[in-house]
Amino acid sequence: MKRFLFLLLTISLLVMVQIQTGVTSQNATSQSSPSASSNLSGGGFLFFVANAIIHLFYFS
């Protein structure tokens, strides 16, 4: 049961990171949109937080 919850948490956090960074959304970029580096830094931060939470739950 613990492994199933870990897998469910991992999948949901990865989907959340993809939605947040716009990987799954099909939005067209305009000239006034922020650069890709700012978008990637937000995704990198969310990935780090998700990874830390996953390890805390898995090793507890």
Swiss-Prot record:
Residues bearing carbohydrate: N27, N39
Subcellular location: Cell membrane
Covalent lipid sites (GPI-anchor amidated serine): S35
Pfam families recorded: CD52
Region forming the signal peptide: 1-24
Alphabetized InterPro entries for the sequence: CAMPATH-1
Keywords: Cell membrane, Glycoprotein, GPI-anchor, Lipoprotein, Membrane, Signal
Coiled coil regions, renumbered to chain: none
Bilayer disposition of the protein: Lipid-anchor; GPI-anchor
Propeptide: 36-60
One of the record's GO cellular component terms: sperm midpiece
GO BP: any one term: positive regulation of cytosolic calcium ion concentration
Biological role stated in the UniProt entry: May play a role in carrying and orienting carbohydrate, as well as having a more specific role.
Protein name per the record: CAMPATH-1 antigen
Native organism: Macaca fascicularis
